[in-house]
């Protein structure tokens, strides 16, 4: 028996927006009769930037900034046609990057 999975990978800088988007996707998938595995939290990517505080000399005075990219993974097992249609029509937050693999 051949089962089809939909793998959804979400990325965002703000983890609260990411969690609300995953909740929306999970509730939509369960409402249409599909099984959902996840959300699985993936490792957070942290990019650090170090800059001088002043425009002139004084190399000892520096400031660090970081940018965190939070990620989640969802697997939808045996999706129905209603599930696929509902996921395509779903409107998520602007700060969330969605990758869908069939």
Curated annotation (Swiss-Prot):
Which keywords does the record carry?
Answer: Ribonucleoprotein, Ribosomal protein
Q: Does the keyword Ribosomal protein apply?
A: yes
Q: Which GO terms describe its cellular component?
A: ribonucleoprotein complex; ribosome
List this protein's GO terms for biological process: translation
Which Pfam families does this UniProt record tie to the protein? Ribosomal_S10
**Key word Ribonucleoprotein present in the record?**
yes
Report the superkingdom from the record: Bacteria
SMART domains, per this entry? Ribosomal_S10 (SM01403)
A single MF term (Gene Ontology): tRNA binding
Protein's job: Involved in the binding of tRNA to the ribosomes.
Family of the protein in this entry: Belongs to the universal ribosomal protein uS10 family.
- Xref: NCBIfam families: PRK00596.1, rpsJ_bact
Q: How does it assemble?
A: Part of the 30S ribosomal subunit.
What name goes with this protein? Small ribosomal subunit protein uS10
Q: Native species of this protein?
A: Bartonella tribocorum (strain CIP 105476 / IBS 506)
């Amino acid at each position: 028996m051949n089962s089809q999975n939909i793998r959804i990978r979400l990325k965002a800088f703000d983890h609260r927006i990411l969690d609300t988007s995953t909740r929306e996707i999970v509730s939509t998938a369960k409402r249409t009769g599909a099984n959902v595995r996840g959300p699985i939290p993936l490792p957070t990517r942290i990019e650090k930037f170090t800059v001088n505080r002043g425009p002139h000399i004084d190399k000892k005075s520096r400031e660090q900034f970081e940018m965190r990219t939070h990620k989640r993974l969802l697997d939808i097992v045996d999706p129905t046609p209603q599930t696929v249609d509902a996921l395509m029509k779903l409107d998520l937050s602007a700060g969330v990057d969605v990758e869908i693999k069939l």
